[in-house]
Structures are given as structure tokens and as C-alpha cells.
Swiss-Prot record:
It comes from Meyerozyma guilliermondii (strain ATCC 6260 / CBS 566 / DSM 6381 / JCM 1539 / NBRC 10279 / NRRL Y-324). Belongs to the TVP18 family. This is Golgi apparatus membrane protein TVP18. InterPro entries: TVP18/Ca-channel_flower. Its main location: Golgi. Keywords: Glycoprotein, Golgi apparatus, Membrane, Transmembrane, Transmembrane helix. The gene is TVP18. Glycans are attached at residue 24.
Length: 172
């Protein structure tokens, strides 16, 4: 049984609303981080066509988006062939304070792009700062670091989830 788009979307938005009901800032930071991945890739590619040194920050933005993918979707660390150094580097960010610092550093790098020219990369800088603030609030409030509960394939007992788990097992 194939997954339909409506099933996937309802599972994603169901997980999204379930996460927001928990009132945990680390979950908010994770969702902002996931959205920032899309922004990094889109705005990094869009700004790469500037005829100035902004190209450097565009490339950095694309690389940041790819690194954030591995930080926010740890499942990819298991299925992608990566070096042990990179994997251990990414695993350092499994708590609120390290993620706060990580996103703050990413934000500062993109804020520095404003020294060259004002571009849409400021949006990426703002969202990195928001993610950092969410992780900082979670750490200050002593909230447990949680990972999002959304499951694209559905609930654990559903047929779609079993098919998704079977595919993952075959990949691994």
C-alpha cells in the first residue's frame, strides 16, 4: 500500500500540532530548524547569482542548510555514508545548550553577510537566531531536549508505518 500525499500531510501536520501542544521550546527550535533548511537551500541558491562577494555567503548558506539537515534529522546519519568525525561532530548537538550555540553561530555568520550587501540572506539569519532563542529558552527553563513526534508514515501500528519501517530496515 503506497502512501498518499494526503496521508503524509495529515501525519506531518498532526505531529506538528502534537508538538506544539507539549509547550517545549526545544520542539519549537527543531521545527524552526527544519524550516530553516528549506530557507537556506532556497535563498542560498537565489543569492548565488549576485555579482559580488555575497556569493561566498550564499555558498556558506547552502552548506549550513545541509549541515542542519544532519543536525535536525539524525536518521540520516545512519543511512548516509559519512566520516566518523562528521558523525561525532553532529552528535555533539544532542542537548539544548549546544544547539543554542550552534544556531547562534550560524546566525552570526549570516548576519556578517550584511557587511557586504543587504540581501535576502537576512531571513536565514533571523530564523537561525529564532531557533537559537528557542533552544536557549528550553535550556533556561530546564526543559528536556525532545525530538519531534511527527511520523510521515503514520502511527506505529498502522500498515503504512510498518511498510516504512521495513523499507528503512532494508536500507540499513
Amino acid at each position: 500500500m503506497a502512501l498518499s500525499i494526503s496521508t503524509v500531510m495529515s501525519n506531518v501536520f498532526g505531529g506538528f500540532s502534537a508538538d506544539f501542544k507539549k509547550k517545549n521550546f526545544s520542539l519549537y527550535g527543531q521545527w524552526i530548524g527544519l524550516f530553516t533548511i528549506i530557507l537556506c537551500l532556497a535563498l542560498g541558491i537565489a543569492n548565488i547569482f549576485h555579482a559580488s562577494l555575497v556569493i561566498i555567503f550564499s555558498i556558506i548558506c547552502i552548506v549550513q542548510g545541509l549541515v542542519v539537515v544532519f543536525v535536525e534529522v539524525p536518521f540520516l546519519l545512519r543511512i548516509c555514508p559519512l566520516t566518523d568525525k562528521f558523525t561525532s561532530f553532529i552528535k555533539n548537538f544532542d542537548e539544548n545548550w549546544p544547539r543554542c550555540g550552534f544556531y547562534l553561530l550560524m546566525s552570526v555568520i549570516q548576519w556578517l553577510s550584511l557587511t557586504l550587501q543587504t540581501t535576502s540572506l537576512i531571513v536565514v539569519a533571523v530564523f537561525f537566531a529564532l531557533a537559537s532563542a528557542c533552544y536557549a529558552l528550553a535550556a533556561i527553563k530546564h526543559q528536556e531536549y525532545l525530538k519531534t513526534s511527527f511520523n510521515v508514515a503514520g502511527e506505529q501500528g498502522s500498515l503504512e508505518a510498518q511498510v516504512g519501517e521495513h523499507v528503512v530496515r532494508n536500507v540499513l
